Regions:
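A short, solvent-exposed beta-edge/loop patch
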Residues: 112-139
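A short, surface-exposed interaction/processing loop segment used at functional sites
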Residues: 132-152
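Solvent-exposed interaction surfaces and binding hotspots enriched for charged
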Residues: 34, 41, 80-83, 102, ...
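Bacterial Sec-dependent N-terminal signal peptides
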Residues: 1-26
């Protein structure tokens, strides 16, 4: 009985987390100057070369459950998107796994582990006139994400 209750609790937490991330992307999906993209596992399997913006993710595409991208080149929206994203990352107990500040670009990679062994990473890249959030869930490692962030 304890196992059933624990399993239900974990499933509920996973659903709430997915809902919070979904809310971020949906909040800005119909906003002028904001581009949102959702790519499912099935779609990634059908595509040969998978790119997230200028990043090649073909090497890990088969291990992903989904890929979400939010990109905004409208400077007036950047503070709001940043604040919303960071609030969600804090509320959902993401940990900062890597930060890079280089030439005016600030990149933070947040991560979380799930009980089923899957990992979720959110890459938040902020430049002077642009913000990009890339959210990935699957059987992936930090090294995979660093390869994407570094453009390898």
């Amino acid at each position: 009985m304890k196992r059933i209750i624990l399993t239900l609790c974990l499933a509920t937490v996973a659903c709430l987390t997915a809902f919070a991330q979904k809310a971020l992307f949906e909040k800005y999906s119909d906003t002028d100057g904001v581009t949102t993209v959702y790519i499912s596992r099935n779609m990634m399997r059908m595509m040969g070369n998978v790119r997230a913006g200028d990043k090649d993710i073909s090497k890990i595409a088969s291990r992903l459950d989904y890929l979400k991208i939010l990109s905004c080149e409208r400077p007036s929206l950047i503070p709001s998107i940043k604040k919303t994203a960071q609030s969600i990352f804090n509320q959902q107990k993401y940990s900062i796994v890597m930060q890079v500040n280089e030439g005016g670009e600030h990149t933070t990679i947040y991560g979380r582990n799930y009980p089923n062994g899957k990992k979720e990473f959110a890459l938040l890249a902020i430049e002077r006139n642009e913000i990009t959030i890339i959210n990935l869930l699957g059987n992936i490692s930090l090294q995979d994400i660093q390869g994407i962030a570094g453009g390898k």
